[in-house]
C-alpha cells in the first residue's frame, strides 16, 4: 500500500527537519492554508468497527473535492494512538482479503493535542515519541505552555474542521465529539448527546418512545449479572414472540448479534438465551433482547449539514439478500466481506406513500435525538404499513457498498457533493 501522499512529505519534510520546528507558536505554510479549507479526517479507533472505519475513510478521501479541501488523514490505532504518515487509507478496499487496520510504520509520527489552542492545537511529534511513555509522550495531550515542547513538536497548522469517520465506541459515541467541543473545533456530525444516545440502543428507544415513534418491543439485560431463567420470565412477561434478536446495546456492524429461535422446552430455551447474551456481552455488558419484527428492513439517509437546519431525507433503500437459501440475518460478513451476499435497491420497492412515511419517520427520529450533520435511520416496515425505527447510526458506513452514499446518489446528491455539503455546513 502507498504511504501517505507526497503532499505530506512536502509539507513536513524529512523527519526531524529543523526548519519545521514550531517557532513562537506560529504555524507554517500559511499560503496553503489560505488556499483550501484544511480538514482533519479521523479514522480507525479503538472500537470493533476499526477496519470498517478504515474502508469508509478510503471512500471519503476518494470522494472529497481536493480543489476546495486539503484532507489531513489522522489514524487512530486500536490501542488509541493518534498518528499521521502511516499507510495511505486511499489504497484500502473490500477485496475479500484481510481487513485493514491503522498500523505504525517507520514514517509514522504521533499527533498530539493542546486543547487550549483550539483549531491551532494539533501538533506532531517525532517517530520516536510514539511509544516513549517514559519521556512524557505516552499521552495524546500536551501543553504548549511548556517551553520544552517548542523544541520537539511541529505544528500541524490551522485546522478548519474535523471529519470523524469513526464507527462505534470511542468515536461515534460522543467521546471524540466532546473532545472537539472542548477544543472549539468545528466537526461534521451529531453532537455529544445525539452521538451518545444513538450509540446506546437502549437509550435510543427511550428517546424515541418518548417522542411517540414506534420501536421494536424488547427488554434490556445486564450481562454481568443475570440468570437465563429470570431473562426468560421477563421475556414472557413482556409478551415477546420468537424469533428474538439478542445484541449489544453499544456496538454496531452486527457485532455480537444472535438470532434466537423458539425451543421445544424451557431448559433448551434458557441455554440458547444464555449463550446469546454471553456472545453479546463480549462487546457490551448492556444487552438488548428484542422481538423479531415481521417486516422489511428499510433504511433512510438523513442530511442536515448545519445544526438547526431542517433535515433532508433521501429516498429509502433496502438491502436485498441474494443468498435466498440462507436463513440468516444481515450479519457482518454480508455487510462487508461478501459483495455477492446482497445488493442495494434505492428506492426500495414499496408504494410511494410508504416511502414518504419512512422519510417522515426518519426526519422525526433525527430531530427527536437532536441530530446534526448526518445519520442513517434504519426502520422496519410491517405488512400493514407501520414504520418502526430499529436504530439510528450517527456515522453510517461510507464504504463502496454502503447504503448512505448510495441512497443520496439515487436521490440526486453525488458522493462528492455529499462530502462537500457536510464539511461546508460546519464552516458556515
Swiss-Prot record:
It comes from the Bacteria. Mg(2+) 1 binds at residues 378, 391. GO terms for biological process: cell wall organization; peptidoglycan biosynthetic process; regulation of cell shape. The keyword 4Fe-4S does not apply. Keywords: ATP-binding, Cell shape, Cell wall biogenesis/degradation, Cytoplasm, Ligase, Magnesium, Manganese, Metal-binding, Nucleotide-binding, Peptidoglycan synthesis. Cell wall formation. ATP binds at residues 237-299. Belongs to the D-alanine--D-alanine ligase family. Its EC number is 6.3.2.4. It comes from Bifidobacterium longum (strain NCC 2705). This is D-alanine--D-alanine ligase. The lineage of its organism: Bacteria, Bacillati, Actinomycetota, Actinomycetes, Bifidobacteriales. One of its GO terms (molecular function) is ATP binding. Its cofactor is Mg(2+); Mn(2+).
Amino acid at each position: 500500500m502507498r504511504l501517505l501522499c507526497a503532499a505530506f512529505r512536502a509539507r513536513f519534510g524529512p523527519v526531524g527537519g529543523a526548519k519545521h520546528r514550531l517557532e513562537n507558536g506560529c504555524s507554517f505554510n500559511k499560503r496553503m492554508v489560505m488556499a483550501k479549507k484544511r480538514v482533519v479526517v479521523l479514522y480507525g479507533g479503538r472500537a470493533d468497527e476499526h477496519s470498517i472505519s478504515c474502508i469508509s475513510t478510503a471512500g471519503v478521501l476518494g470522494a472529497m473535492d481536493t480543489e476546495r479541501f486539503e484532507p489531513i488523514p489522522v489514524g487512530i490505532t486500536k490501542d488509541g494512538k493518534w498518528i499521521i504518515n502511516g499507510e495511505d487509507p486511499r489504497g484500502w478496499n473490500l477485496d475479500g482479503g484481510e481487513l485493514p487496520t491503522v498500523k505504525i510504520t517507520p514514517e509514522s509520527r504521533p499527533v498530539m493535542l493542546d486543547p487550549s489552542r483550539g483549531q491551532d492545537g494539533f501538533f506532531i511529534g517525532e517517530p520516536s515519541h510514539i511509544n516513549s511513555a517514559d519521556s512524557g509522550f505516552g499521552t495524546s495531550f500536551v501543553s504548549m505552555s511548556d517551553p520544552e515542547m517548542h523544541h520537539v513538536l511541529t505544528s500541524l497548522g490551522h485546522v478548519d474542521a474535523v471529519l470523524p469517520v469513526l464507527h462505534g465506541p470511542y468515536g461515534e459515541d460522543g467521546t471524540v465529539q466532546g473532545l472537539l467541543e472542548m477544543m472549539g473545533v468545528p466537526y461534521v456530525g451529531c453532537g455529544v448527546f445525539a452521538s451518545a444516545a444513538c450509540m446506546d440502543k437502549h437509550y435510543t428507544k427511550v428517546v424515541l418512545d418518548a417522542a411517540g415513534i414506534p420501536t421494536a418491543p424488547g427488554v434490556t439485560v445486564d450481562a454481568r449479572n443475570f440468570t437465563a431463567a429470570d431473562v426468560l420470565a421477563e421475556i414472557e412477561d413482556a409478551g415477546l414472540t420468537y424469533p428474538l434478536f439478542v445484541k449489544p446495546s453499544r456496538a454496531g456492524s452486527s457485532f455480537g448479534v444472535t438470532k434466537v429461535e423458539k425451543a421445544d422446552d424451557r431448559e433448551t430455551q434458557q441455554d440458547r438465551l444464555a449463550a446469546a447474551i454471553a456472545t453479546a456481552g463480549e462487546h457490551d455488558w448492556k444487552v438488548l433482547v428484542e422481538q423479531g419484527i415481521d417486516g422489511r428492513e428499510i433504511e433512510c439517509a438523513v442530511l442536515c449539514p448545519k445544526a438547526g437546519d431542517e433535515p433532508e431525507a433521501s429516498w429509502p433503500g433496502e438491502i436485498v439478500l441474494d443468498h435466498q437459501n440462507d436463513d440468516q440475518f444481515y450479519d457482518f460478513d454480508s455487510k462487508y466481506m461478501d459483495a455477492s451476499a446482497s445488493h442495494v435497491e434505492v428506492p426500495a420497492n414499496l408504494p410511494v406513500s410508504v416511502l414518504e412515511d419512512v422519510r417522515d419517520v426518519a426526519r422525526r427520529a433525527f430531530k427527536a435525538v437532536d441530530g446534526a450533520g448526518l445519520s442513517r435511520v434504519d426502520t422496519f416496515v410491517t405488512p400493514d404499513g407501520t414504520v418502526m425505527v430499529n436504530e439510528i447510526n450517527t456515522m453510517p458506513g461510507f464504504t463502496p457498498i454502503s447504503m448512505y452514499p448510495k441512497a443520496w446518489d439515487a436521490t440526486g446528491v453525488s458522493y462528492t457533493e455529499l462530502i462537500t455539503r457536510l464539511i461546508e455546513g460546519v464552516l458556515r
